[in-house]
Amino acid sequence: MRKMVNIGFIKMGNLGMSQVINLIQDEIAAREGITVRVFGTGAKMGPADAADTESFKQWNADFVVMISPNAAAPGPTAAREIWKDVPCIVVSDGPTKKEAREALEQEGFGYIILPVDPLIGAKREFLDPVEMASFNSDAMKVLSSCGVVRLIQEELDRVTEQVASGKSGEDLELPHIFAKPEKCVEHAGFANPYAKAKALAALHMAEKVAQVNFPACFMLKEVEQVCLTAAAGHEIMGAAAILATQAREIEKSNDTVFRQPHAKNGTLLKKVKLYEKPE
């Protein structure tokens, strides 16, 4: 008999991917064999917020997915110390350096590092709730259409299947993935090469956003410089979302959108033509 799998999600702060990561394994709320619970700390991700996640251990997750910006920051680092005795997959936009990623693996953590999940222009002079929501909407358009969502979903399903089959703890094989644009787009299932090229361009643009917004967030002081730079970063993200939409529209016009829904038992089904049944 297959085991019921408890999957915990710890959300500290916010990435674009944070919006849907706990939903992508059960997209129509009909999957059997998994139970999902989420512990979130809102927009903040400090050490005190990390300490609060310990109460989530009472739920006894088989593995947890810890998503936050900058996994090397003090808060996420403190959270990993709390959760080091539970199989844990870190999903973050950094660290991007090989040595830091290898350190995560040596400490027993899985990871999916997403340099394509963009840094928002988080300065009071520029960002209000509407701008924040709009930016995250643009980010999700790229993450969903260009392969990032499917990459993460497939990796989480792979670990889930191991638990369902009886593996646990240190026996689980966790992912160790640095999800550069070229890797992400291969998971999108594009049939048309021009659609794929547009999606790859969108991913490269999303990766560039952090380079533009970082000075606005942490270095620049003059209001005009802060606002101009952050606005430029957000314009890049908006343009990337348009490219991602165009890529999917090409596939729709050819009736070649690749879909991969879950069966009730969690098996991945496939379909391409709109009127086909998934098999």
Curated annotation (Swiss-Prot):
Mitochondrion recorded as keyword: no
Protein name: F420-dependent methylenetetrahydromethanopterin dehydrogenase
Gene: mtd
Pathway terms, separated by semicolons: One-carbon metabolism; methanogenesis from CO(2); 5,10-methylene-5,6,7,8-tetrahydromethanopterin from 5,10-methenyl-5,6,7,8-tetrahydromethanopterin (coenzyme F420 route): step 1/1
Transmembrane segments: none
GO biological process: methanogenesis, from carbon dioxide; one-carbon metabolic process
Organism: Methanosarcina acetivorans (strain ATCC 35395 / DSM 2834 / JCM 12185 / C2A)
GO molecular function: ferredoxin hydrogenase activity; methylenetetrahydromethanopterin dehydrogenase activity
Role, per record: Catalyzes the reversible reduction of methenyl-H(4)MPT(+) to methylene-H(4)MPT.
Alphabetical UniProt keywords: Methanogenesis, One-carbon metabolism, Oxidoreductase
Protein family per UniProt: Belongs to the MTD family.
Signal peptide span: none
EC number: 1.5.98.1
Any one Pfam family match given in the protein's UniProt record, by short name: MTD
Keyword Oxidoreductase carried by entry: yes
Catalytic activity line of the entry: 5,10-methylenetetrahydromethanopterin + oxidized coenzyme F420-(gamma-L-Glu)(n) + 2 H(+) = 5,10-methenyl-5,6,7,8-tetrahydromethanopterin + reduced coenzyme F420-(gamma-L-Glu)(n)
